[in-house]
Regions:
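Catalytic cores of the polymerase beta-like nucleotidyltransferase superfamily
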Residues: 1-440
Length: 440
């Protein structure tokens, strides 16, 4: 039922994860599954849901429900039902309110009392009942509708769109964790650009992640797009085209957020131009603040923020002018994010000037070749000082402490500047540095 039927019609069904519904109560479901399933667990027994697995196929069985909501939180007052039709009418969208009744003899009957198939074939996201009632019951459904725009490439029905615009403020009843979960599904959707556009058009983005619609206020300095917002959507689309395999959540977030620092750093220059100096620094701080507010995992926050911080670095590279030291620093600063940084930088080239676009891509090709050439001679992924902390303490007769760390950092900078050194060269350089430190 629900999403399983929808995905089966669309040819997207994963046979490893199926949803069922029944008039049997949760305790009865558990009893029936014992001896058949390889494992059974309580997914949410208070909501009537039991999960099981057999032969690698996970199933989720939920008792018919006919819930009501308190209209303050989104928590339903769960009431188990006896009729499939009552269960379907409470679903979020018509396309999710279809079921296939399976008889004991294996017979199948398609159940669609609310026009789900018509909505599905038309590519329209509509609600079984009035959208105002549905969204009052559970405001998260507004964001879920936008998520389906991204996942399926469908559009909101006129009445669902209008109700979402009118009721967008109700999303504040929802916990940030639930919102973030829907945003993730939206961002990794096959039609993520359309999803982000709908998020902004409905007014939900203004309440959830206002930095995205805020980019509409800043003109694109290259005048290739109406504004930075439109440019960022193009970068997102181009980053998606560069993905290898599965959707990359971090890359996509970095693509849509890479220029969020521009409105705050916009300056009108005396020559009539517009500048956004240090927008990558400001943008990285804004990314951390917003994603922390949405309670994203720390690793995701740091990866996205670091990509935003580094996305402009390449633009200082022109005509092979970087030293080997600068190339090493680029690789070291990016660390494991380097493959994503390559894609983000390439995606950020949105100029319609074919000559300029070709030059930018040639320059980045050259940089990647430089990186590969240096990597053949040294391990750029593990650039470390040529002497470790114990050796530093022994050579300089130092106890453990801050000065050892300072010496280590000096040697790392030296390693980045010069490349690999012999032990004798490293020791001599350290002694010279130490002599200068003692005199200062």
């Amino acid at each position: 039922m629900g999403g399983s039927v929808r995905d089966a019609v669309l040819g997207r069904l994963s046979t490893g994860d199926l949803d069922f519904t029944t008039d049997a109560r949760p305790e009865q479901v558990q009893e029936l599954l014992r001896g058949w399933a390889e494992a059974i667990w309580d997914t949410g027994i208070e909501f009537g849901t039991i999960s099981a697995v057999r032969a690698g196929i996970q199933i989720e069985i939920t008792t018919f429900r006919a819930d009501s909501y308190d209209r303050v939180s989104r928590n339903p007052q769960v009431r188990f039902g006896d009729r499939l039709e009552d269960d379907l009418v409470r679903r979020d969208f018509s396309m999710n309110a279809m079921a296939v009744k399976i008889g004991a003899d294996g017979s199948q009957e398609f159940i669609d009392p609310l026009g789900g198939m018509d909505a599905l074939l038309a590519g329209v996201i509509d609600t079984p009942a009035a959208p105002e009632d549905s969204f009052n019951d559970d405001p998260l459904r507004m964001l879920r509708g936008v998520r389906f725009v991204s996942q399926l490439g469908f559009s909101l029905s006129p009445r669902v769109f209008a109700a979402t615009v009118e009721m967008a403020g109700q999303i504040e009843r929802i916990t940030v964790e639930r919102i973030a979960a829907e945003l993730d599904k939206l961002i990794v959707g096959e039609h993520a650009v359309e999803g982000v556009e709908t998020l902004c058009e409905t007014g939900l983005a203004e309440l959830i992640i206002p930095e995205i619609p805020g980019m509409k206020l800043a003109i694109d300095e290259h005048h290739q797009h109406k504004d930075v917002y439109t440019h960022s959507l193009t970068v997102l689309a181009q980053a998606m085209d560069l993905e290898d395999g599965d959707p990359d959540l971090v890359l996509r977030w970095a693509a849509i957020l890479h220029d969020i620092g521009k409105p705050a750093t916009r300056r009108h220059e005396p020559n009539g131009g517009v500048s956004f100096h240090h927008h990558e620094v400001v943008g990285a701080k804004m990314v951390r603040k917003r994603l922390r507010a949405l309670k994203y995992p720390k690793a995701v926050i740091e990866d996205v923020a670091n990509l935003v911080f580094l996305h402009l670095r390449f633009h200082g590279y022109a005509d092979n002018q970087w030293t080997d030291s600068a190339v090493r620093r680029y690789v070291t600063d990016a660390g494991p994010l380097l493959p994503r940084l390559h894609k983000l930088v390439r995606a950020d080239c949105t100029t319609r000037n074919k000559r300029r676009a070709r030059k930018l891509q040639q320059n980045y090709d050259n940089l990647e070749q430089r990186i590969a050439r240096i990597a053949e001679q040294e391990d750029l992924a593990k650039v470390r000082p040529d002497l470790d902390g114990n050796t530093i303490m022994e050579l300089l007769d130092l106890p453990p402490g801050p000065m050892v760390g300072k010496a280590w950092r000096y040697l790392k900078e030296l390693r980045l500047d010069r490349g690999p050194m012999s032990r004798e060269e490293a020791e001599e350089s350290l002694r010279q540095w130490w002599a200068a430190e003692q005199q200062s």
